[in-house]
Amino acid sequence: MIKNNLLLFLLVFFAGCGFSSPNIVIILADDLGWNDVSYHGSEIETPNIDKLISSGVELDRFYVQPTCSPTRAELMTGKSALRLGITRPISKNQRLGLGLEEKILPEYLKELNYSNYLLGKWHLGSYTPEYFPTRRGFDYFYGYLSGGIGYWDHVHGGGHDWQRNEVGLREDGYATQLIKNDTLRIINEHDFTYPIFLNINFGAPHIPNEAPEESVLKYSYIQDETRRLHAAMVHEMDNAIGEIFVALEDKNELENTIVVFASDNGGLTPDVKLNPSFLAIPKIIGICNTENRFGISLFQWVCENYSGGSSNKPLPEGKMSVSEGGIRVPAAIWWPGKLEYSKSQNFISMMDVLPTILDLINYENQLNVDGESRVNSLSDVTNPETSKYVVTNIINDKYAVIDMPYKLITSNEGDQLFNILNDQSESTNIAEENQAIVSELKNILSQWQFGENKSLPISEVLKDPDLFGGEEDRIPWVEKAFKNSETNLTPNNGGDLKWVLLFGIVIILFISVWIYRK
């Protein structure tokens, strides 16, 4: 009843004011930690994100997958990443991306005459052009296809990765600012007779830790250098969000715009636990403290992933983990005059965003999705809707099942059950005395839909790691995709297998020295 009344009100409102369908802006941060925003008490100042939170619906129990591609797949489809077979980041040499048979958000919006723009990160497949966003409902794409680039050089894994509409683009500038500038241009030039969908996927604050000097100096009071750089990257993103809001206001469109903000997963913290565990060896034996790391890209990749400057406190762990710090993220939905400020403790996951948005704009066709519309939760934050959600870690050896207020983490190490409403730090395992609940949650897991896993084996990824920034040793990725479509789909390898073998030798030597010292 509440939902029907809200939708009726919105329809009458638009009819009376002569407005078109509302604009939609989805802003995704990349690896933004729970304690990386000032409204959670962080030392990092985020006034524009805070303003969005304080005047919209703060989604305090917003859950995602613990890595980027799985979360982005859920956003685009409304389906579980496990059902889609996307359970870890899509590697640059991975032939399969988000299934081409899947209908994604811009394709739904096309039916309602939206103009669809994607700016920033895609990361849902790029091995051949058929996976490009411009082949999947987006009218325009400016940014990069892979999981991360150098902020200044726009390089990923040895290849340049920056384009506009399937054409490689070489331009100077800091990636966050370039994404912002192009977004402002689009807003200023758009004919708002037709509604616009802006999917703005910032790379910040994903590694590498790079930021303009003036932003770094702003945080000179932060002693730790990595944290200081991380803060500057968040600052750049927050400034960009503020300017985008001003541009919409200048066009008199801010009141007619739905904004969704979230991070794709928890922050990458300095104490991250890489899997497989042997990847910790370069850090243990001090390679990560050397300048050149012997010129080995595998060592560089490992050490980069130990250079995270995020904080998820008081939530445990972070990116790649199924603990709260990896999957519970800052988030809000904002629509002035229609959604009043509130702090919602109701559960919502990334796969609920698509059906919720389509419900808000009165999309009437049948949906084949796993997520649910949360319009009731947005209009009545005291309405305790329930939902079941399953996540997995980066090597798929640990699963978490959420059915509020309980969360079960199951692995070969045993079962852990937490009441996450009362124990967000996950410090008290209550599995032993609640075996009936454990059984119920295991039953949810057993009935969950799992699709064929599209991920490359970890061993294949390590042969040619996905580095972020650095020297170019191959053709740009957009060019490689077109070549792949014409040839035998050979990987764009930089010939790093010899270094994998050397890495194995180092492991053997390390173990030998350890045994000798014992």
For the regions a language model picked out, list residue spans one by one.
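Positively charged n-region of N-terminal signal peptides that target proteins for export
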Residues: 1-5, 515-518
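Sec-dependent N-terminal signal peptides
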Residues: 5-15
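Small-residue packing motifs within transmembrane alpha-helices
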Residues: 11-12, 500, 508
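Hydrophobic membrane-targeting alpha-helices
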Residues: 14-18, 512-515
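Formylglycine-dependent sulfatase
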Residues: 17-411, 415, 424-443, 450, ...
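Polyampholytic, low-complexity intrinsically disordered segments
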Residues: 462-464
